[in-house]
From Swiss-Prot:
Family: Belongs to the IF-1 family.
Protein's name in the database: Translation initiation factor IF-1 2
Subcellular localization: Cytoplasm
Function: One of the essential components for the initiation of protein synthesis. Stabilizes the binding of IF-2 and IF-3 on the 30S subunit to which N-formylmethionyl-tRNA(fMet) subsequently binds. Helps modulate mRNA selection, yielding the 30S pre-initiation complex (PIC). Upon addition of the 50S ribosomal subunit IF-1, IF-2 and IF-3 are released leaving the mature 70S translation initiation complex.
Alphabetical UniProt keywords: Cytoplasm, Initiation factor, Protein biosynthesis, RNA-binding, rRNA-binding
One example GO MF annotation: translation initiation factor activity
SUPFAM superfamilies per UniProt: Nucleic acid-binding proteins (SSF50249)
Superkingdom of this protein's organism: Bacteria
Family matches, as PROSITE patterns: S1_IF1_TYPE (PS50832)
UniProt main location, coarse: cytoplasm
Length: 72
């Protein structure tokens, strides 16, 4: 999949789930399932409920997302 196909959005982490998965509420009100990207996992970046994150969604499955950036 090309990088051009992704949709980037801002959201807030609602809760931690097993296997580095999180429930994220997007700015538009939708709640999606997000997992940590590989670079964030390799650099041991911690994500806690309440953190603001940037997620990437594919146009094929809008219920799942990849967390690519965490802001304070």
């Amino acid at each position: 999949m090309a990088k051009d196909d992704v949709i980037q959005m801002q959201g807030e982490v609602l809760e931690n789930l097993p296997n580095a998965t999180f429930r994220v509420k997007l700015e538009n009100g939708h709640v999606v399932l997000g997992h940590i990207s590989g670079k964030m996992r390799m650099n041991y970046i911690r994500i806690l409920p309440g953190d603001k994150v940037t997620v990437e969604l594919t146009p094929y499955d809008l219920s799942r997302a990849r967390i690519v950036f965490r802001t304070k």
